[in-house]
A protein has these predicted regions:
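Alpha-helical transmembrane segments within multi-pass membrane transporters and channels
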Residues: 39-41
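Short, basic and Ser/Thr-rich N-terminal targeting/leader segments
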Residues: 30, 66-69, 198
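C-terminal catalytic lobe of FAD-dependent flavoproteins
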Residues: 72
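Glycine-rich phosphate/adenosyl-contacting loop at the front of the ribokinase-like
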Residues: 1-37, 48, 220-221
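Conserved phosphate-binding/catalytic region of the ribokinase-like
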Residues: 2, 178-266
Length: 266
């Protein structure tokens, strides 16, 4: 019913998740080839991730000597969540790790805001800038204004398709009208923008058109992973050359399934 307070006894469950993993899970379900280029570190959380990857036959592309972090997800009765995060190996990239990638084998790349927040040496941004053929999907998340501004602008100038919710785009653009906020962000990115609106669906904007796609009615149990499943579906559908209206209808359908159950994945 509420966030925990003094002397509360809280039941905990440990499960694997995270933005990139949740997106990869959707891609896998939709038979879309992908590589999960995410560091796996040490410690109890690193061991937990490593065991899960082995069970699911997910290749570990990066082994880090740093400890893995974790994220406490507190979910209230309405399904809304609060995150308490300890950033670990999964958020810190090294330039040499990208040497194993042949960028010509890829068409699309998904980037989460948390990685960019910790990308102090800008190795992720440098890789993306070096391969302009890649279509970038960027989900900055609620930490959009915590990312160092100069670093964030470097990424936005690479023309990513930005995926964020209404509160996030309002806070970033300092606007309170959705179409004006999208127009403001578009002036920077010059690429499509998708804004998720919770129970009201989502909104698409580019220089030629804008439209609203209604949500699928469902009973909300847990909103963890809703945005990840939405952008994951978009990436999978666009890789199959699906048009934007149909793509967003499908994304809303998958997101509604995710929020109707406990956990961040289907």
């Amino acid at each position: 019913d509420a966030l925990p307070i003094y002397e509360n006894i809280i039941h905990q469950e440990l499960s694997i998740g995270g933005c990139a993993y949740n997106v990869a899970h959707i891609l896998d379900n939709m038979h879309c080839p992908y590589d999960l280029f995410s560091p796996v570190g040490q410690g109890i959380y690193g061991d937990f991730v490593r065991k899960h990857f082995k069970e699911k036959k997910i290749p570990i592309m990066i082994e880090s000597q740093q400890k893995n972090g974790c994220c406490y997800c507190l979910v209230d009765d309405s399904g809304e969540r609060t995150f308490i995060c300890e950033h670990g190996a999964e958020y810190f990239y090294q330039a040499s790790w990208f040497d194993q990638l042949d960028a010509n084998n890829y068409q699309q790349v998904y980037v989460c805001g948390l990685e960019i927040e910790e990308d102090h040496d800008e190795v992720i941004i440098q890789f993306l800038a070096s391969h302009p053929h890649l279509t970038i999907y960027f989900a900055p998340g609620p930490r959009i204004n915590a990312i160092e501004r100069k670093r964030l602008m470097k990424l936005l100038y690479l023309h990513p398709i930005v995926h964020l919710n209404q509160q996030e785009i309002f806070e970033f653009t300092k606007q309170n009208d959705l179409s004006i906020a999208c127009a403001s962000l578009y002036q920077i990115t010059q690429a499509p923008i998708i804004v998720t609106l919770g129970k009201d669906g989502c909104y698409y904007y580019d220089e030629k058109t804008s439209f609203h796609t209604p949500s699928i009615k469902t009973t909300v149990v847990d909103t963890i992973g809703a945005g990840d499943s939405h952008i994951g579906t978009i990436i999978a559908c666009r890789s199959q050359d699906m048009n934007w209206p149909d793509c967003l209808i499908k994304a809303n359908q998958i997101a509604s399934l995710v929020v109707s159950q406990k956990g961040s994945t289907l």
